[in-house]
Amino acid sequence: MAPDNDHFLDSPSPPLLEMRHHQSATENGGGCGEIVEVQGGHIVRSTGRKDRHSKVCTAKGPRDRRVRLSAPTAIQFYDVQDRLGFDRPSKAVDWLITKAKSAIDDLAQLPPWNPADTLRQHAAAAANAKPRKTKTLISPPPPQPEETEHHRIGEEEDNESSFLPASMDSDSIADTIKSFFPVASTQQSYHHQPPSRGNTQNQDLLRLSLQSFQNGPPFPNQTEPALFSGQSNNQLAFDSSTASWEQSHQSPEFGKIQRLVSWNNVGAAESAGSTGGFVFASPSSLHPVYSQSQLLSQRGPLQSINTPMIRAWFDPHHHHHHHQQSMTTDDLHHHHPYHIPPGIHQSAIPGIAFASSGEFSGFRIPARFQGEQEEHGGDNKPSSASSDSRH
């Protein structure tokens, strides 16, 4: 038993093929694992991962165990492996290395890899590593109080004129408001003519009415309309009446008549000794929101719509009267038959008349369409103006 025991004690221990050196991953830099000494070198075996992810230690540091081959090399290698009959690629690689041993020995020898040297190199690199620099943004110093105040005042002066954008001026704002809220008003235009100084309580009476007038006296309780009287000395007189000048000036017919009124027969008028007058009765403008049915129901039927808007009048018998003849709204309600003096001839243009001597007599502008006759005690019989307009 003793020899056996001695043999057991003296028997050499089997050669250690592997020496495991537990190193941390931060020390060797080969990844999270342990360094295992194998025949011919060392490997870095990954902890908690498969063996194929481990690395081998070479003269130039740890490298992957798996070798990636190019496509032509992989084809040739697998062809050798198949011809050798090996089932693993590593066996084919060992055969190739053995056959090329003489050529490999002729190569220069490389120093073996020492893990201690690698650890010292990594420690020195970590100690010499410089701290990373970070950029710090330094804010500029705040301006002085005086500079801040001047800067703020300058900005207020620059922005004072541009409080509203250029497109938002007063005109555009007014147009925008009118587009959303239309205002039905006829007194929005302003003219340089003086306003009416008469009473405006009878503006409602100046509605659609067309009536001729004769030599009948006007009613004393009514005011005078606008009167233009043309004389032989080519003078023009104006008298404002109850109707406002703005409302009468808005009518397009009034603008046409105003352009047509011109007296160029001064010499002929002096020789004939006659006097022509132009009477302008300024009716109030109808409100645009009144419909035609409302107007007819309020004011009664119209006498005539065929009566020309312009009529010439000329009466040589009134030469002894004053040159300024007035006409009132009550005078328009008198239903005198419209009479054309013998010395007046109507031209082809309605509303223009000439005297027998060929002189221009003048224009007769009707005051308004007849309405509100019952207020003045007039009857409702139709006027002769409509029949006279069809001559």
From Swiss-Prot:
It holds the Pfam family TCP. The keyword Nucleus applies. Residues 1-34, 122-168, 317-345, 363-391 are annotated as: Disordered. Its main location: nucleus. PROSITE patterns: TCP (PS51369). Expressed in cotyledons, particularly in the vascular region, in leaves, roots, buds, flowers and immature siliques. One of its GO terms (biological process) is response to auxin. Residues 49-107 form the TCP domain. Keywords: Developmental protein, DNA-binding, Nucleus, Transcription, Transcription regulation. Residues 381-391 have a biased composition (Polar residues). InterPro entries: TF_TCP_subgr (IPR017887), Transcription_factor_TCP (IPR005333). It is found in: Nucleus. GO terms for molecular function: DNA binding; DNA-binding transcription factor activity. GO terms for cellular component: nucleus. Plays a pivotal role in the control of morphogenesis of shoot organs by negatively regulating the expression of boundary-specific genes such as CUC genes, probably through the induction of miRNA (e.g. miR164). Participates in ovule development. Interacts with SPL. Interacts with KIN10; KIN11 and FLZ3. This is Transcription factor TCP3. It comes from Arabidopsis thaliana.
